[in-house]
Amino acid sequence: MYNVELRSQRSQTNQKERKEGCGLKYRVVSVLKDNRPRFLIISDIEEIEILPSKYLKHLDQINASPNTVKSAAFALSYYYNYLQEQTIGLDEITLLSYSEQNKHFIDFLYWVKSGKHTEHNTQTSNKTCNMYLGAVFRYYQFLALEDVLPMLKVLRVKKVSYFDSMGVNHQNAVNSFKGFFKEEEPNLEEITSEEIQELINACTNDRDRLLIAMMAETGLRLGEILGIHYTEDIDFERRTVRVRYRESNTNLARAKNAEYRMALLSNTTFEFLVKYISDNRKSLMNSEYLFTKLTGKNKGEPLDADSVYSMLKRLSKKTDINSHPHQLRHYFAEERRKEGWDLNDIRFALGHKKVETTIKYLGENNERL
């Protein structure tokens, strides 16, 4: 599908991995246990914070995805730093009045919006701010269910009654907190096949060329691609790649919805895949993952999402093309629609449970589809 010329692999210095946590009192650390990453929140004197770490363990036990647990860990570390700055504790928050609690959490939203939770005061999108606060609220709910703290007043459910035009009384349950930011409309520009080819040509190694080609050609999620085990998931006779659900991927890659499905590769991309494995047999020998880190102290470890985003950012500077894994997945869906694929086939290829999700994903209305 794409011209993925093989080139000699160049030596390059990887961008330093993003530091976990920030330079404030509380930060996130991860440890490997049973071949799975476990997240903890520790203080600046290297003490484990018991309550948030207990909650993160609970998320592991209910089989939340590693990325969900990681996201919750960072959100709670930010919130604990905010509490430290405000010199107030969890128990004191629960004693505040409704209006005081409401103000406290709105202030937290603005605090992360301004980037005070990061070392470099990097501003945060409304959607991400809301995600952080949602994680904090779920933590408070967990503590309430464990009888550690009373339920927050802003999280108590209110019942609202109203009469319709026929005089029938209805009751709806609504959450009390209304302070979430209005989320920005997604502004993800479409990417063209020419731009994808330009990105591939700008890559400095065969791994990145193959990764971009596969994302655009299969419609697989980034986590699904990074979770591919070349020893188990590739059918060399049928030219297919299988998505498998695994909990133990050390790079946090996981198939969403615990699903299994296959993606067919074009002749060109499959030939490149085979040659990539053959040429990199030595470096792949100690790993079962198709995509691994190429240089540095972590050489040979499974490639993770942060490294992919860093790679796309470098390519953006070289080509002036802003790209994103989701953008490449959306490209796949749009191309299949143009080719006349049935909507259910597109749904299955994308791994959506409901066709309504696919319709929304394509940004189309029922009539046109």
How should these model regions be labeled?
Residues 52-67, 76-166, 198:
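N-terminal core-binding DNA-recognition domain of tyrosine recombinases/integrases
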Residues 350-369:
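Catalytic-site neighborhood detector that most strongly recognizes the C-terminal catalytic loop/helix
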Residues 145-147, 215-239:
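Short, charged phosphate-coordinating catalytic segments
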Residues 266-320:
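Active-site/catalytic core of tyrosine-dependent DNA strand-transfer enzymes
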Residues 227-270:
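Conserved tyrosine-mediated DNA breakage-rejoining catalytic core shared by Y-recombinases
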